[in-house]
Amino acid sequence: EWVEYMTFDGVSPMADLRAENGHEKPWTVDFFGIGNENWGCGGNMNPEFYGNMYRRYQTFVRDYDGNKKIRKIACGANSDDYEWTQEVMKACFRRISPQQHGMMDGLSLHYYTVPETWDHKGSATEFAEKDWYKTMKKTMYMEELIRRHSAIMDQYDPDKKVGMIV
C-alpha cells in the first residue's frame, strides 16, 4: 500500500489518501530499498532469513506507472561480511528464471569510514591530522570490498544485471 500511496496516479483508497494529505500528484520513485541494515538495527536477521523476507516483500513493490520502473534494492552486507552477500544472493536466486535476476536491481553495500570504532568515531569537522590519514586509509579499503562482493554477486548474476549500490 505504501508504494501505491506514493506512486499511483489514479483513483484508489491510497492515492485518494495521498491527495487528502496534500500531495495531489504521485511521486516518482526511482529506487526502493527493501530493508536497511537488516544484519543489525534493521531486524538482527541472518542472511538466509533476510533473503527470504526480501523475496516476499519485493513482490509488493509494484510499478503503478507502466512507463517508470521502480528499481528494487536488497540490503547488502556490512563491510566485509561476505557470507551475507553469498547467502542473500543464494536465497534470492534460488528456483527462479534467469530473467528475474534475483528479483532485484541492486544490492547495497554498507561501509563507514571512521578513524576509530563506530562508538568512538569523533567529530566530523574537528579532528587531528592523524585521524584524517586513518580515515583515508580506511577509504582505500573500499576497492577490496567492491571487488570481493562483486565476485560473489557474479557467481549468481554473471550478466551483471544486479548493480552494487554503495
Task: Give residue ranges: language-model regions.
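N-terminal catalytic cores of secreted or lumenal carbohydrate-active enzymes
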Residues: E1-K130, E143, R147
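Long hydrophobic segments that form regular secondary structure
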Residues: D131-V162
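The start of beta-strands in P-loop NTPase/AAA+ ATPase cores
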Residues: D105, V162-G163
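Hard-cation-handling environments
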Residues: V166
